[in-house]
From Swiss-Prot:
Family statement drawn from the similarity comment of this UniProt entry: Belongs to the class-I aminoacyl-tRNA synthetase family. IleS type 1 subfamily.
Catalysis performed (reactions): tRNA(Ile) + L-isoleucine + ATP = L-isoleucyl-tRNA(Ile) + AMP + diphosphate
Subcellular location per the Swiss-Prot or TrEMBL entry: Cytoplasm
The protein's name in its UniProt record: Isoleucine--tRNA ligase 1
Cofactor names: Zn(2+)
Annotated organism of origin: Bacillus cereus (strain ATCC 10987 / NRS 248)
Length: 921
């Protein structure tokens, strides 16, 4: 008889190799055929809603690792919520207006100047839709479950109409105004920018100290002094109209040779050192407030520079006397306005100096620095020129420096509802907690929001102008424009004349002849995405406002979190979200930012093509995503190893349940052995721990808990000793069915627990599980932890056994290395434990030699009675010897009962009995 044919070896068609790059697309096709998103929504209908609102990625180019991290994190949460008593719809969105799309078309050779704005915008829309399609397929490949057929797209007419309504509501409340103010201006984009469109990079700039002679000392100064200012933007000097000093600071008149200079007293030493003054002495001090209304002369133009008081003046750098150009700085503008100065801005849209800067007209602002500095030297006003590298604002799209420039723009007055914004921030739950401080400080300190852009591709600002120049924004005009946009899209604004965009028969006192013109600026794209709470959450039947959660990268505190909060509080008085969760950026394995120049860019597509989407998802679950995270081939190799461990665990469980029918073979908990019940206690601990981790969005804790359970609790212990029973005993042996009962519970629970993270693998495992009826594991709920009677005592006892078992394993390892035994089944062990451990061992009814995977087990005396040469460990001394007897051909246990049964001479007594009872006809 071939005894190997009498072994119940694992049997399953579940493949050992994942082959995910091929298998996942097939699984996704299956999901599409069964309409998995709709099925889950149907299955969870009527449950409380949990709405995670998708911050729209920008529709341009392939998805990158930041997109993958973001979408997968969202998918974890939505999938988990739909398995824990919620209906969790997930509507993906795209942000589709803005400069990058205009640039992409120009780069493709579109001749923009040869077509109308409306024609150009049509091309922009076509391009945006192509990009949406491209990204949609890539997000689906990640295994993200969403309403992919019904996303929200910011260029769609229904969305634009709601955005117009948001603008109209804000205007009605008096929050929208037009004003000339210095704004961030990008000469390369030829448009105003919002704070969220700015990034800081190092820039080399001239650093100059300039003397402004006093013209009128107002009886405080003698008239022969000179104010010293410091600036890193010499090109703004043609726009200088004043000097700001701090009212509370003390200023010193410093005599240096024949000159007298005015600087802040506390900066005397620093300035003296920088300007290399020798024998400088302070001849007089005055308070800043006394210098108000004294007048200096512009160094190279025949005009005055008024001395004014400003709280923005500091002594962190410079001289305490601040060059003030109301057309080129926010503080300058505020102070200048207070003192009635004009807003002089001699720089055009392209960043070129105009005729209002005589002598420098036609020069690009950055190129004007040198001739202006030379002019200062020529007139004897330049005291020092050096160069510094400092952090300077750049256009986040073109990566070129920007300037402050006063222009006529549309603003949303944050000041008008700042208090409500701060209250809304305080009422929101922030994860990580520092998010609250970050947004609170931004809201507290931010100026009014410049919402107009001088571009073509965006939502028009729905304002008309009367013949006398009055802007027209009324309920009637707003509603009419919203209706037009809903019907025709926003391109209608560029296709029709102003009068054809107004309600029929519309009149206005400022237009006696019935003539009107329309605004040509468009809205900031942050106003687009920031209106999604109205256009999506409020408008769609399957969603609700406020959303339960917004989840984006930490750059969105100044972006989408901020703009959404501003528009929602302005319109509804409340935040659009109950909670906000943020994640860090994806860096390479060495912690460097990914860039083309370094050549360290990791793309999601490559990972999915080589390893699979579930490996990428498992990586997302493994990282501390609330900080910046790292990815590299080595890191992915480690993650793939963990995946293999989890997959092999599933395969082992399935293989050993091939002949198990849950309805017939399940053993009641009360009839299980202690070790089996202990395994169920460990499973319940896992369920509790994993669900708590999902609840707190701690996916790394889920990853580690599942990995440890598969490796330590199952592979290294339970499954290891269970093989002897599963393979060797007869199919219906009570111990075998007991173990299968536990394995079945473990398999079902484990499959569900990994579903949010590894949906492809979980749904691949699911149909192989005996007795399941659901079409997909996604249509089930998370397992519930069952409280077993006496669980705590059981856990205490068997945890103690596990620590003692570790001592035994160490001793067996030593014996193997010393060639006392080959493998552990060759061993006979005698234990000399501590009193506590001895009592514990004596209370165990299970076969201890099976639990230790040895052929013979003896309990000797106490630890102190152990032979002197026996290795001693924390809980026991262990004597390892070669077991006596021969090796059984069937179970490989060394036994003295081999051959006792004449019909089965090579088998031990146990195997002979099993064979006779189960396999001999």
């Amino acid at each position: 008889m071939e005894y190997k044919n009498t072994l119940l070896m694992p049997k399953t068609e579940f493949p050992m190799r994942g082959n995910l790059p091929k298998r996942e697309p097939a699984m996704q096709e299956k999901w599409a055929e069964m309409n998995i998103y709709e099925k889950v929504q149907e299955h969870t209908k009527g449950r409380p809603l949990f709405v995670l609102h998708d911050g729209p990625p920008y529709a341009n180019g392939d998805i990158h690792m930041g997109h993958a991290l973001n979408k997968v994190l969202k998918d974890f949460i939505v999938r988990y919520k739909s398995m824990t008593g919620f209906c969790a719809p997930y509507v993906p969105g795209w942000d589709t207006h803005g400069l990058p799309i205009e640039q992409a078309l120009t780069n493709k050779g579109v001749k923009r100047k040869e077509m109308t704005v409306a024609e150009f915008r049509k091309l922009c829309a076509e391009y945006a839709y192509e990009q949406v399609e491209r990204q949609r397929e890539q997000f689906k490949r990640l295994g993200v479950r969403a309403d992919w057929d019904n996303p929200y797209i910011t260029l769609e007419p229904a969305y634009e109409a709601q955005q117009i309504k948001v603008f109209g509501d804000m205007a009605k409340k008096g929050y929208i105004y037009k004003g000339q103010k210095p704004v961030y201006w990008s000469p390369t984009s030829e448009s105003a920018l919002a704070e969220a469109e700015i990034e800081y990079q190092d820039k080399k700039s001239a650093s100059i100290y300039v003397a402004f002679p006093v013209k009128d000392g107002k009886n405080v100064l003698e008239g022969d002094e000179k104010y010293i200012i410091w600036t890193t933007t010499p090109w703004t000097l043609p726009a200088n109209l004043g000097i700001s000093v701090h009212p509370e600071l003390e200023y010193a008149i410093v005599k240096v040779n024949d000159e007298k200079y005015i600087i802040a007293s506390e900066l005397f030493e620093t300035v003296a050192k920088t300007l290399e003054w020798e024998n400088a002495e302070v001849v007089k001090t005055v308070k800043g407030s006394e210098l108000e209304y004294t007048v200096a002369k512009h160094p190279f133009y025949d005009r005055d520079s008024l001395v004014m008081l400003g709280d923005h003046v500091t002594t962190d750098a410079g001289t305490g006397c601040v060059h003030t150009a109301p057309g080129h700085g926010e503080d300058d503008f505020i102070v200048g306005k207070k003192y009635g100065l004009e807003v002089l801005c001699p720089v055009d849209d392209k960043g070129v100096l105009t005729e209002e800067a005589p002598g420098f007209e036609g020069l690009f602002y950055d190129k004007a620095n040198k001739p202006i500095t030379e002019k200062l030297e020529e007139v004897g006003a330049l005291l020092k020129l050096t160069f510094i590298t400092h952090s300077y604002p750049h256009d986040w799209r073109t990566k070129k420096p920007i300037i402050f420039r006063a222009t006529a723009q549309w603003f949303a007055s944050i000041e008008a509802f700042r208090k409500e914004l701060l209250e809304a921030v305080a009422e929101t739950k922030w994860v990580p907690a520092w998010g609250e401080t970050r947004l609170h400080n931004m809201v507290r300190d931010r100026g009014d929001w410049c919402i107009s852009r001088q571009r073509a591709w965006g939502v028009p600002i729905p304002v008309f102008y009367a013949e006398n120049g009055d802007p027209i924004i009324t309920d009637e005009t707003i509603n009419h424009v919203a209706d037009l946009f809903r019907e025709h899209g926003s391109n209608v604004w560029f296709e029709r004349e102003a009068k054809d965009l107004l309600p029929e028969g519309f009149t206005h006192p400022g237009s006696p002849n019935g003539e009107f013109r329309k605004e040509t600026d468009i809205m900031d794209v942050w106003f687009d995405s920031g209106s999604s709470h109205q256009a999506v959450l409020e408008e769609r039947d399957d969603l609700q406002r406020p959303a339960d959660l917004y989840l984006e990268g930490s750059d969105q505190y100044r972006g989408w979190f901020n703009s959404s909060l501003s528009t929602a509080v302005a319109v509804t008085g409340k935040a659009p979200y109950k909670g906000v969760l943020s994640h860090g950026f994806v860096l390479d394995g060495e912690g460097r930012k990914m860039s083309k120049s370094i050549g360290n860019i990791v793309v999601p597509k490559k990972i999915m093509d080589q390893l699979g989407g579930d490996i990428l998802r498992l990586w997302v679950s493994s990282v501390d995503y609330q900080s910046d995270v790292r990815i590299s081939d080595d890191i992915l190799k480690q993650v793939a190893e963990v995946y293999r461990k989890i997959r092999n665990t599933f395969r082992f469980l399935l293989g050993n349940l091939d002949d198990f029918k849950p309805s017939e073979n399940t053993v009641a908990v009360a009839e299980l052995r202690e070790v089996d019940r202990y395994m169920l206690v460990k499973l319940n601990d896992l369920i509790t721990k994993v669900k708590e981790a999902y609840e707190t969005y701690d996916f790394a804790a889920v990853y580690h808990a599942i990995h440890n359970f598969c490796t330590i609790d199952l592979s290294s212990f339970y499954l290891d000793f269970a093989k002897d029973i599963l393979y060797i005993e007869g199919a219906n042996h009570e111990d075998r069915r007991a173990i299968q009962t536990v394995l079945y519970d473990v398999l079902v629970a484990l499959t569900k627990l990994v579903t949010p993270i590894l949906p492809h693998t979980a749904d691949e495992v699911w149909p192989y599980i005996p007795g399941v009826t659901e079409e997909s594991v996604q249509l089930t709920d998370m397992p519930e932890a069952v409280q077993l009677d006496g669980a705590e005592a059981l856990k205490t006892k068997w945890d103690a056994f596990m620590t003692l078992r570790d001592d035994v394993l160490k001793a067996l390892e030593v014996a193997r290395n010393e060639k006392v035994i080959g493998k552990s089944l060759n061993a006979s062990i005698t234990l000399y434990p501590t009193a506590e451990m001895k009592a514990m061992l004596e209370s165990i009814n299970e076969d201890l030699k099976q639990l230790f995977i040895v052929s013979e087990y003896k309990l000797g005396g106490m630890m102190e009675e152990a032979p002197a040469d026996a290795p001693k460990y924390e809980h026991t001394a262990v004597v390892v010897a070669q077991a006596t007897g021969e090796t059984c051909e069937r179970c490989w246990v060394v036994s003295e009962t081999i051959g006792k049964d004449a019909e089965h001479e090579t088998l031990c007594e146990r195997c002979a009995t099993v064979v006779k009872e189960n396999y001999v006809k």
